[in-house]
Structures are given as C-alpha cells and as structure tokens.
C-alpha cells in the first residue's frame, strides 16, 4: 500500500489537488463519485462520451440525458461537481472543489495499461472514497479486524 499512497501523493502534487484516490479505472472512479454524491436530478452528459458513462448511469438507475455539445480535455457531469477528465493530463490542472476522475488506460498520456484516480478537495472525501475503493474496508488493517460500514 506504500507504493499506492506514494502514487496518489505524486498525482495530487502534479495536478495541484489536495488529495488523490487511486482506482482501477476512470469509469469506476466516476461510479464511486456518483454513489458518493447520489444525485437525485437528471445528469447531463455529452452525446460523444465513452460508452461506459451512460452504462454506469443505467447500472446505478440514475436519470441522464445526452446533450450534443463539443468538449475538449474534460467535461462536467452536469448537475454534479464530478468531472470526467479521462483524457486530461495537465500539470496544475485540478479544478477546485470538484471530484475529478482520471484515466491511466493504455492509450492515455500516463499509460499504465489500466487504472484511474479521483482528485478531491477534502480529507473527508478522500477517506470515504478510499474506503469505497476497497469495498468499505480500510487498506491499513486486516479485513477481519474491521467494522465495515461503507459500501463500495
């Protein structure tokens, strides 16, 4: 876990974000953020987005509509402060007070084969999203010793 925490620290530093939570993909980062926020209103997404985004909305039973608009680098899931920044790799590029989701898929600038991260602004967001990444478990203690209260 030491390597993961160091990776999170370096990604947060690169983007100048207070915190970064490592995930297994940008899609799962977005899903965790949607579960965390549980928006009730219809979410607006660009018509030309990656197919996993509307599939995630369907999976979570969240209403969404497509908007035919151009975007570059990143876009907001309108109605939330969640940002799909899967193709955005910019030093100092964190948008304050957002949950900014990154991708490290094999065709991205930082190509790790697979992976993602959530940039966030508070310790509370970091702590909860980190636990959600591990199915409600903390990463610093054996699961048998934990009182799991959060669902990932």
Regions found by a protein language model. Give the residues of each.
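Short coil/turn segments at beta-strand junctions that form active-site/ligand-binding loops
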Residues: 18, 40-41, 79, 98, ...
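Active-site region of PLP-dependent enzymes
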Residues: 89-91, 96-152
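Phosphate-binding glycine-rich loop
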Residues: 5-43, 53-59, 66
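PLP-dependent aminotransferase-like
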Residues: 35-92
């Amino acid at each position: 876990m030491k390597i993961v925490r160091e990776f999170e620290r370096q990604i947060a530093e690169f983007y100048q974000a207070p915190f970064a939570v490592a995930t297994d993909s940008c899609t799962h980062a977005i899903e965790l953020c949607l579960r965390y926020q549980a928006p009730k209103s219809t979410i607006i997404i660009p018509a030309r987005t990656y197919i996993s985004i509307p599939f995630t909305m369907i999976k979570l039973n969240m209403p969404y509509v497509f908007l035919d608009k151009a975007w570059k680098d990143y876009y907001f899931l309108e109605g939330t402060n969640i940002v799909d920044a899967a193709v955005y790799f910019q030093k100092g590029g964190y948008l304050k007070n957002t949950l900014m989701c990154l991708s490290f898929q094999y065709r991205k600038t930082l190509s790790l084969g697979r992976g993602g991260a959530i940039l966030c602004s508070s310790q509370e967001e970091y702590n909860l999203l980190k636990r959600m990444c591990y199915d409600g478990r903390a990463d610093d203690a054996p699961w048998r010793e934990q009182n799991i209260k959060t669902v990932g």
